[in-house]
Amino acid sequence: MRSKKLWISLLFALTLIFTMAFSNMSVQAAGKSSTEKKYIVGFKQTMSAMSSAKKKDVISEKGGKVQKQFKYVNAAAATLDEKAVKELKKDPSVAYVEEDHIAHEYAQSVPYGISQIKAPALHSQGYTGSNVKVAVIDSGIDSSHPDLNVRGGASFVPSETNPYQDGSSHGTHVAGTIAALNNSIGVLGVSPSASLYAVKVLDSTGSGQYSWIINGIEWAISNNMDVINMSLGGPSGSTALKTVVDKAVSSGIVVAAAAGNEGSSGSSSTVGYPAKYPSTIAVGAVNSSNQRASFSSAGSELDVMAPGVSIQSTLPGGTYGAYNGTSMATPHVAGAAALILSKHPTWTNAQVRDRLESTATYLGNSFYYGKGLINVQAAAQ
């Protein structure tokens, strides 16, 4: 009898242990968060006076992790799981929760464009971009290149903190088209005396979070840049990105952005972001015969065209190479803006844009060509 009682007690104890173990596993499973993703959390304008600490608390209380709070955009970059996203969308202080999308460089493969946009006519008059600051918001610039004069910069890529290293080559190529030096070697840029600033927002694979791009644009605003070149883009819109682009333009900066390399798709626009925003100058690509490049994105948002096929420019390591893309067309426009500002330093960014667009050479249907090919000689009159 005693043996039977002992066996029953042992069985009960084992049952209790297994029950507690499985109960604990269930609690752990239930408490495990879903896959976290990167988001941008925007706060309502009525909450603009809310302290940074309070904004951080709003996100943290929902289980989110704040990565960065912006200076000119009433928003923060954060890592959130699905539950936190749902709860933040219900919070009365939150205006929006949007995915922190990834933008990619617009370059396809592996120049003449300087003459095609008539930049030498201004060079011969002594206007070469002096005293104009151009922010190249891209993958960094190889500052050791003998054909480039990089005056400063910053990196917003967490894993690649040196803005003067360019693992993708993209930013260095873009920089050369804007301002390769007039020094008898290599190539000549549109605006060879302009001051280049390397604002790194794309990593060595040519990709970058929208939040990195926002940080880069904020840096350009804070450091009083005159021109911003963005040879990058993504397919998704962003309230935060639009806000900071608009802020840059309202601060007096000329903003040129690549339209994209998505070609045309019937009557649908294929222009990417941020070029799609009205405040930017959206740039498409043509070849040396002024024919639209087959890869050049089309849409009603397209503003102007510039050379973007077989563009020879600087590459890391003191070398040179030819690339194709609206990424290569855009720096022709940024360089042209710098040339105009060197001749007319009191002109506003709106005046520069208007002159570039109103004097462009008509090439065809605006859906595919915008206002046409820029003519910086005419624009600077």
From Swiss-Prot:
EC supergroup of this enzyme: hydrolase
- What SUPFAM superfamilies does this protein's entry cite? Protease propeptides/inhibitors, Subtilisin-like
Q: Where in the cell is it found?
A: Secreted
What does the record note about the cofactor?
Answer: Binds 2 calcium ions per subunit.
Q: Which residues form the Peptidase S8 domain?
A: 111-380
> Which Enzyme Commission number(s) are on file for it?
3.4.21.62
**GO MF term set:** metal ion binding; serine-type endopeptidase activity
Which cofactor is recorded for it?
Ca(2+)
In terms of Gene3D superfamilies, this protein maps to:
Peptidase S8 propeptide/proteinase inhibitor I9, Peptidase S8/S53 domain
Question: What are the residue ranges of the propeptide?
Answer: 30-106
For this record, an example GO cellular component is:
extracellular region
Q: Where does Ca(2+) 1 bind?
A: Q108, D147, L181, N183, I185, V187
Q: Which CDD domains match?
A: Peptidases_S8_Subtilisin_subset
Reaction(s) catalysed by this chain, per the record, are:
Hydrolysis of proteins with broad specificity for peptide bonds, and a preference for a large uncharged residue in P1. Hydrolyzes peptide amides
**What range(s) does the Inhibitor I9 domain occupy?**
38-103
Q: Name one Pfam family in it.
A: Peptidase_S8
Query: Active site at which residues?
Result: D138, H170, S327
Has UniProt tagged this entry with the keyword Secreted? yes
The record's Gene Ontology biological-process terms are: proteolysis; sporulation resulting in formation of a cellular spore
**Leader sequence segment:** 1-29
Keywords from UniProt, A to Z, are: Calcium, Hydrolase, Metal-binding, Protease, Secreted, Serine protease, Signal, Sporulation, Zymogen
Q: Which residues bind Ca(2+) 2?
A: A275, Y277, T280
Name the family. Answer: Belongs to the peptidase S8 family.
Q: What else is known?
A: Secretion of subtilisin is associated with onset of sporulation, and many mutations which block sporulation at early stages affect expression levels of subtilisin. However, subtilisin is not necessary for normal sporulation.
The entry's function note states: Subtilisin is an extracellular alkaline serine protease, it catalyzes the hydrolysis of proteins and peptide amides.
Q: What is this protein called?
A: Subtilisin J
Which species is this UniProt entry from? Geobacillus stearothermophilus (Bacillus stearothermophilus)
